[in-house]
């Protein structure tokens, strides 16, 4: 009997040890699985104007330091925590101000307010070499920083970079595809009207410019297939500081002009002086009633995807009636 009791006791102890071992194994397995399921912060590398930058995770607190970059983020569904002030508006362009509520102003494109940027504790800063190259190292010390190269001409180049930087490359492709479809549709609707020569002039404080093809609006006109007057059919930006002797170079089948006003009233006075000049009144576009004043923010200053689409709205409305 004693021997049987000893055997039973030994078996009971062995059973408990086996159960305990199984329990430990399950806990370790569960723990290992838990470790596997724990989220990892993926990183990606962006090549840009200043080199390469590694970004961890999808940025949630983005500071943008160009006007066209602000439009890019908004089109991608990203509301920045900070942005540079618009060149016109207080502080944002009229066509984006409803989307910018709560966004902090961090200076202008040049100069930006580095201290204000740091206070926002961004996880990504997007800027531009042309505007902010000298402070790149300061910005990089605050957060991962990506710079575009230039601000002139084709807006899509910078847009694609910004989309990659905020980890929304696919969304960016959709935005561009939608825009390209608008270009194709409008071009088809206009038909032979794109053969009309389109002239563009800008009035600024102390400066009058005749715009060529490598400008924001010039690129869009070319995408639609519009002809340009011989004096403007050039692959550079613009003729700056034009004198009144150059007014004949402003002629075209249709003339669009836009005025950048800095609040001094100087540009508006310059505009009035020039459009009332006998040489200007003698332009064929004036005589045929084909001169149109358009919004400078849309046709030039903002320079982004939202402005590009609004410029298409203007062209559709005006040119379909020609």
Go through each PLM region and give its residues.
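A short, structured surface patch at a secondary-structure boundary
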Residues: 69-116
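Structured C-terminal subdomain patch of bacterial secreted/periplasmic proteins
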Residues: 254-322
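Basic- and aromatic-lined ligand-binding clefts that recognize polyanionic substrates
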Residues: 61-73, 173-227, 231
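Proline-aspartate-enriched helix->loop->beta-strand connector
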Residues: 121-126, 144, 252-253
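Extracytoplasmic substrate-binding proteins
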Residues: 134-205, 302, 306-322
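Bacterial signal peptide processing site
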Residues: 23-26
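Extracytoplasmic ligand-binding site segments that recognize negatively charged/polar headgroups
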Residues: 90-92, 132, 149-161, 197-219, ...
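C-terminal motif of bacterial Sec signal peptides marking the signal peptidase cleavage site
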Residues: 17-21
């Amino acid at each position: 009997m004693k021997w049987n009791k000893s055997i039973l006791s030994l078996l009971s102890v062995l059973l408990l040890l086996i159960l305990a071992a199984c329990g430990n194994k399950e806990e370790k397995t569960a723990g290992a699985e838990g470790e596997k399921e724990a989220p990892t912060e993926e990183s990606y590398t962006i090549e840009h104007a200043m080199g390469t930058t590694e970004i961890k995770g999808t940025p949630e607190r983005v500071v943008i330091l160009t006007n066209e970059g602000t439009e890019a983020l908004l089109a991608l569904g990203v509301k920045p925590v900070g942005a540079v002030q618009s060149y016109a508006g207080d502080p944002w362009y009229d066509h984006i101000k409803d989307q910018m509520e709560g966004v902090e102003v961090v200076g202008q494109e040049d100069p930006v307010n580095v201290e204000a940027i740091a206070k926002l504790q961004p996880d990504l800063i997007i800027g531009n070499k042309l505007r902010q190259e000298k402070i790149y190292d300061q910005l990089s010390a605050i957060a991962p920083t990506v710079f575009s190269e230039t601000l002139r001409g084709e807006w899509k180049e910078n847009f694609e970079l910004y989309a990659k930087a905020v980890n929304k490359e696919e969304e960016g492709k959709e935005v561009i595809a939608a825009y390209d479809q608008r270009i194709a549709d409008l071009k088809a609707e206009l038909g032979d009207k794109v053969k009309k020569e389109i002239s563009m002039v800008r009035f600024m404080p102390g400066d009058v410019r005749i715009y060529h093809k490598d400008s924001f609006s010039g690129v869009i006109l070319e995408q639609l297939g519009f002809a340009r007057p011989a004096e403007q059919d050039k692959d550079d930006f613009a003729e700056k500081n034009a004198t009144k002797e150059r007014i004949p170079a402003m002629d075209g089948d249709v003339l669009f002009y836009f005025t950048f006003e800095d609040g001094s009233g100087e540009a508006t006075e310059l505009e009035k002086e020039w459009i009332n000049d006998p040489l200007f009144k003698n332009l064929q576009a004036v005589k045929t009633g084909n001169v149109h004043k358009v919004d400078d923010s849309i046709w030039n200053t903002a320079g982004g995807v939202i402005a590009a689409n609004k410029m298409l709205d203007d062209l559709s409305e005006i040119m379909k009636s020609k």
